[in-house]
Amino acid sequence: VKNWLLKFFSLLRYLLPKNIGNRFLIVSTTGLGDTLWGTPAIRALRKTYPGAYIGVLTTPLGKEVLKNNPHIDEFFVLRHLPIFSLLALLSHLRRRRIAKIFIFHTSQRPILPFCTWLGASHIVATAGINKGLDSLLTQPMPAKRQHEIQRRLEIVGCFGDVSMEIFPSSASPLQETSPPIPVVGLHPGAKDLFKQWPPSHFIALGNRLKDHLGCHIVVTGGPEEKELVTKIVRGIEGAKAMTAPLSISDLAALIQQMALLVTNDTGPMHIACAVKTPALALFCPTDPILCGPYHVPKSRILQKPITCTPCLKKKCRDPFCMRQIGIEDAFQNSLALFYG
């Protein structure tokens, strides 16, 4: 059945009338960091084709990350995957006469077959990461060991500045103090457990930074990380928790106010890079060459080698490899970033 469906969609790609012109659709339906990685490519595409139409197919989270981005003409939001939702989206998108589709990253397997119905002359994506559907691409790009930002720039075929963009809210999430007291942020969570530095290490680091710098400690986290954030705040006298319902633009404004953010490999790390806040990024099982801070002067990567071969990744329930990152090492690197 799978092979029959692939042949059907491949044939459909050739039978449908093809749209032409500079009418582009970006597909990015994964996480916060994945979405931010696409902003340099979107900006470069706009600079190369200033009069083009640029639409973005994304998730509600992705739309929030890209909110107020001046290079995007229109959003198409993928809220659910039932067939009627895709049919409604299909109707809207076909009316836009999309000529070229750039698939940055998608976790939803039906998206690529869906794209074949849009009448685009070109469907471009990196080969090997499309859940066995590479045959539906008109222009498969070779997979390389390169940063995700660079991969997206190559997909759109443009060159440009690699700095990410996000547009923080104008409201200040933290009250100003007089005299000003620096704010140091800790982000102890991550989508996957195997990327998390131990809570006890964050507590010890937060206390040392507070005592040494005389700073305020703010601990950030998503709605599912409230218990983790609360645990760390309780371990650091005077620390403040900042969790949901912060919007992405409010979180960006908060991180922009920080003198430093110490973070696991997760979305807020990329926000810090986008708003130019000094960031200490803690890495072990993931590869910073692919997904770490990229050409960001005010950032440092603190990395240790993996301890399991192969890495268990999402199956890991005790990320002891992350314990290799010592508190003293994190403290000294934090001071170096803070004093700049």
Regions from the PLM with identified roles:
Residues 1-340:
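Catalytic machinery of carbohydrate-active enzymes
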